[in-house]
């Protein structure tokens, strides 16, 4: 609270909106062209903008990062990443066409089958979680949204996240 004017400057968590978007049996992924984790593979996702719904933000990120038009299907997961003050929300989505292209934040975009996913080069633990939660529910019309595991220190990609955001 400002002593002079009484303004309260809230420092709240950031909301990240993303998609696991598919065309037939292939999953859309983007190789990051920006930090953090430049050169690693991720799902289309990014910070929400003012005056948009989470689903709108997720669809916008797919378009910005991979020039992809998606149809949102269902809420997949809500992942609390408290150590970096983020809530990451992913949806299942279907690509309206297989036409994708590199956006300004991506070095490459590709449609991967499950066995082709570059598991050793995933950018963040939430990408791993969302992919596995998608695989678990891809044939289900109804399911409860997932959350992060209680102990995610063994999740691939955790080491890089922990090194970048060490607790003080």
Where are these regions (language model features)?
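Conserved beta-strand segments that form the floor/walls of ligand-binding pockets within enzyme
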Residues: 1, 28-29, 42, 71, ...
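Active-site donor-binding loop signature of nucleotide-sugar glycosyltransferases
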Residues: 4, 32, 45, 93, ...
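Short glycine/serine/threonine-biased micro-segments
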Residues: 4, 16, 37, 44, ...
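Well-ordered beta-strand scaffold positions
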Residues: 7, 25-26, 68
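Conserved Nudix-box catalytic region and its N-terminal flanking loop in Nudix hydrolases
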Residues: 22-64
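Unchanged
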Residues: 48-133, 137, 141-143, 156-168
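Short, highly charged C-terminal tails/helix-capping segments
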Residues: 146-153
């Amino acid at each position: 609270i400002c002593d002079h004017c009484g303004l309260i400057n809230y420092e709240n968590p950031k909301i990240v909106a993303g998609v696991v978007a598919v065309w037939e049996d292939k999953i859309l992924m983007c190789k990051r062209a920006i930090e953090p984790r430049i050169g690693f593979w991720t799902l289309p996702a990014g910070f929400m903008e003012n005056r948009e719904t989470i689903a709108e933000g997720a669809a916008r990120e797919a378009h910005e990062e991979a020039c992809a038009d998606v149809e949102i299907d269902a809420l997949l997961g809500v992942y609390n990443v408290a150590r970096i003050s983020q809530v990451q929300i992913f949806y299942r989505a279907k690509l309206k066409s297989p036409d994708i292209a590199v956006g300004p934040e991506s070095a490459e975009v590709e449609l991967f089958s499950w066995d082709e996913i570059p598991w050793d080069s995933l950018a963040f633990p939430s990408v791993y979680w969302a992919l596995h939660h998608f695989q678990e529910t891809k044939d289900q019309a109804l399911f409860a949204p997932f959350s992060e595991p209680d102990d995610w220190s063994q999740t691939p990609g955790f080491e890089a996240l922990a090194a970048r955001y060490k607790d003080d």
